[in-house]
């Protein structure tokens, strides 16, 4: 069996920044540091931060007064920001800047009196945060659609004053079809010049397609609640390549590789490389050879840290 590695894979700039915000807050202010929702959707990362003194909560009413709270990479609604400000909580915002870009778009549509359609998955924290940017007090509304069926059934107040945005971690192929359906049904609809799916999501989806084309089975390292990791598994499966979403080497089953010659490995944007290395080691213990990295797009994007948490140069 030969191992092939997707490129790029694993951490993106937004995830790097979010994790570093929690780490730096722990170093500068000491534990406990409260984090609203898992800072990124990865079990290994969250447990490591919890051991270091991060306390993960789902709502601000679980946060005591006079403590530091961090908003997760997925972003929060304006109502959550207002609640934090009203309580005087010291907040560091780990929202991915590419999610913030979508928030700004939604807020602008709301101010302009345009209704907004969000393409995304119900219940995902990024979707909840993005929908919470729309101020419906001026009579408009924001709608959530997941697929073409939702578009066909959608009823809006004014189809001539309508715009769309998208969750950043969706399947590019699925989203393209939904956008086409929206433009067919609502010819006057506005939106971003390109969909809001982030560069890292696009790059990892392109890479997993290449991997699935060249391999007999694909392993996606990522947690079950990671949207972008699930999309990678689905993309490989759509190319008729068996694919498995795993948290790490402990989830591997030897029977998956019976008769397999080429094993592809990728990782979601919130999965650290140490987990990939653990998977490679286990496969090599079962007789796999090599770990050849495919050619792919170079990523050199970085996002700045909050001023108080920046490492000071000497």
From Swiss-Prot:
Its cofactor is [4Fe-4S] cluster. The keyword Ribonucleoprotein does not apply. InterPro entries: LytB/IspH. [4Fe-4S] cluster binds at residues 12, 96, 198. (2E)-4-hydroxy-3-methylbut-2-enyl diphosphate binds at residues 41, 74, 124, 168, 226-228, 270. The active site is at 126 (proton donor). Binds 1 [4Fe-4S] cluster per subunit. The keyword Oxidoreductase applies. Keywords: 4Fe-4S, Iron, Iron-sulfur, Isoprene biosynthesis, Metal-binding, Oxidoreductase. One of its GO terms (molecular function) is 4 iron, 4 sulfur cluster binding. Pathway: Isoprenoid biosynthesis; dimethylallyl diphosphate biosynthesis; dimethylallyl diphosphate from (2E)-4-hydroxy-3-methylbutenyl diphosphate: step 1/1; Isoprenoid biosynthesis; isopentenyl diphosphate biosynthesis via DXP pathway; isopentenyl diphosphate from 1-deoxy-D-xylulose 5-phosphate: step 6/6. Disulfide bonds: none annotated. Its EC number is 1.17.7.4. It comes from the Bacteria. One of its GO terms (biological process) is terpenoid biosynthetic process. It catalyses: isopentenyl diphosphate + 2 oxidized [2Fe-2S]-[ferredoxin] + H2O = (2E)-4-hydroxy-3-methylbut-2-enyl diphosphate + 2 reduced [2Fe-2S]-[ferredoxin] + 2 H(+); dimethylallyl diphosphate + 2 oxidized [2Fe-2S]-[ferredoxin] + H2O = (2E)-4-hydroxy-3-methylbut-2-enyl diphosphate + 2 reduced [2Fe-2S]-[ferredoxin] + 2 H(+). Dimethylallyl diphosphate binds at residues 41, 74, 124, 226-228, 270. Isopentenyl diphosphate binds at residues 41, 74, 124, 226-228, 270. Belongs to the IspH family. Catalyzes the conversion of 1-hydroxy-2-methyl-2-(E)-butenyl 4-diphosphate (HMBPP) into a mixture of isopentenyl diphosphate (IPP) and dimethylallyl diphosphate (DMAPP). Acts in the terminal step of the DOXP/MEP pathway for isoprenoid precursor biosynthesis. PANTHER family: 4-HYDROXY-3-METHYLBUT-2-ENYL DIPHOSPHATE REDUCTASE (PTHR30426:SF0). This is 4-hydroxy-3-methylbut-2-enyl diphosphate reductase. It comes from Pseudomonas fluorescens (strain Pf0-1). The gene is ispH.
């Amino acid at each position: 069996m030969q191992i092939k590695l997707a490129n790029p894979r694993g951490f993106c700039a937004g995830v790097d920044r979010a994790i570093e915000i929690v780490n730096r807050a722990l170093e500068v202010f000491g534990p406990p540091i409260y984090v609203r929702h898992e800072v990124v959707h990865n079990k290994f990362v969250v447990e490591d931060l919890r051991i270091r003194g991060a306390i993960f909560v789902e709502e601000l009413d679980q946060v005591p007064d006079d403590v530091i709270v961090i908003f997760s990479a997925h972003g929060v609604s304006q109502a959550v920001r207002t609640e934090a400000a009203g309580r005087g909580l010291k907040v560091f915002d780990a929202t991915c800047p590419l999610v913030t870009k979508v928030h700004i778009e939604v807020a602008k549509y709301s101010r302009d009196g345009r209704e907004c359609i969000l393409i995304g998955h119900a219940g995902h924290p990024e979707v909840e945060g993005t929908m919470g940017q729309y101020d419906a007090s001026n009579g408009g509304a924001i709608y959530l659609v997941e697929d073409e069926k939702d578009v066909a059934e959608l009823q809006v107040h004014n189809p001539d004053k309508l715009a769309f945005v998208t969750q950043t971690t969706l399947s590019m192929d699925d989203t393209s079809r939904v956008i086409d359906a929206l433009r067919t049904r609502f010819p006057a609809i506005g939106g971003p010049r390109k969909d809001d799916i982030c560069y890292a999501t696009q790059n990892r989806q392109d890479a997993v397609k290449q991997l699935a084309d060249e391999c007999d089975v694909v392993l996606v390292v990522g947690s079950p609640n990671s949207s972008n990791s699930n999309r990678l598994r689905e993309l490989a499966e759509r190319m008729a390549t068996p694919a498995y979403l795993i948290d790490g080497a402990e989830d591997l089953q030897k029977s998956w590789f019976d008769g397999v010659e080429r094993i592809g490995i990728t990782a979601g944007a919130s999965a650290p490389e140490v987990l990939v290395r653990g998977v490679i080691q286990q496969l090599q213990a079962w007789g796999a050879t090599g770990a050849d990295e495919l050619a792919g797009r170079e990523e050199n994007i970085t996002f700045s840290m909050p001023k108080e948490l920046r490492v000071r140069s000497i």
